[in-house]
Amino acid sequence: MAIASFRTHGIMTPHDGVTAQIGNTPLLRLANLPELYGVNSNVELYAKAEWFNPSGSVKDRAALYMIEDGLKRGLLTPGKTILDASSGNTGIALAMIGAARGYSVEICLPSTASPERKRLLELYGAHVIETPATLSTDGAIMEAHRRYEHDPEHYFYPDQYNNSANWKAHFFGTGPEIWQQTDGRITHFVAVVGTSGTFTGTARRLKQYNPDIQVVEVQPDNAFHGLEGMKHMPTAIVPGIYDPNLADIRMGAGTEEAQAITRALARHSGILTGPSGGAAVWAALNVAQTLEEGMVVTVLPDGGSRYLGDSFWDDSDTE
């Protein structure tokens, strides 16, 4: 099984909007890297290619689920502005959906976010409020909360870090997709954590299918990391949806190690992903190296095109 996908490739009809294409992303078998890193040939490594979502990241799933939930509960009504804090990808997803559905969007974003992310937000028509780099995503969270508290009638505030609709998007979407795409053969699930929605929802669903599946949570290895979108939970504002008891294994990824794997994925597997995807594959490889047989599945949250201005691509190593 080289590539598995349940995305429909039929002819789109006029009423098929952009949000209808969210989810059902391909599951790619990682080529070459497992052999290079000494993984037993009886161990299979796969990754969900989340840049196939319309705005280019896994966050399309949670953004759509939170917006649909807000509409059902009467929290998002005509004329309201969608407001949230983001390291970039959720903001881009909210901006895309807002543009498609006629809502204004404001995103509080750390000033360290890549220029590509800021530009994408602007192209979708979002108003970007930059927050201090020293506070990382925590500063963006505090600013979004302050703005909402000042004028709650003006905003729909999904609050992705504390909204159960975030992880439910993966419980009802990503988890079942992985189970179907692997024919239930998955033995290990590996995911990085930021809001923790992808990890929490997917892990809970996979455990429901098979309690013996090992779930691996990946955080940055220290507070002063360079992995956009990921949280070092011991030193950050912990999301309300984060479940510290869910992981069977918890791993800390170093920034340089994750960046090295990000480069290696491009050079040896033809996969251009972002640094958080590099962290996920770094952890997946480390898990796979300990196994005699099995199937390890991870999630690549976004593509590498929104990080092309980052200097880590220029490293002269020879992974």
Where are these regions (language model features)?
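PLP-dependent amino-acid enzyme catalytic core
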Residues: M1-E319
